[in-house]
């Protein structure tokens, strides 16, 4: 069965553009069939983005290396670029259709094309390490894959003052993954809202 996390898509392409307002800014994204949350910005990602903005703003952060890990069509990184224009934002994604969309959306945000990386996990990210990483994991891949992605994301944190942001729904096993994150990292809940938990994790 084909999923949005498959490398190639067999579903007929039918691109759309959708727009929405977020924290006083308007955003438009190009999307398509067979990608995650194709018709609208998903609630979990928007909740995590709000928490990231508040976390960075409270600390006076303006720049740094940020990875939108398993980026889909680039929702998280593109929005953050608007609020933190000096942030150096990268994207990684395995699904080629989503990757093409990410290139379009990132280009509209003046993000360089070579910052969008086709990669299964961290396999093609190379020697880059990041100050901040976001992950809304592809839950339907199963726990083994999700845990692998979490660990791989953590391995790309630059140092003990670098942070991994994750969002997982209660119905998707947030409690179980919270225990996993706490076992592997220094991990704390940032917020829980409308069935989604956002956590902040760093190296122990």
Task: Describe each model-derived feature in a short phrase.
Residues 1-23, 34-38:
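N-terminal auxiliary segments of SAM/dcSAM-dependent transferases
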Residues 44-126, 132-135:
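Conserved SAM/SAH cofactor-binding pocket of Class I
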Residues 93-97, 145, 169:
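Short beta->alpha hinge that forms the Motif I/post-I loop of the SAM-binding pocket
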Residues 131-144:
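A short SAM/SAH-binding and catalytic strip from SAM-dependent methyltransferases
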Residues 169-184:
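Conserved class I S-adenosyl-L-methionine
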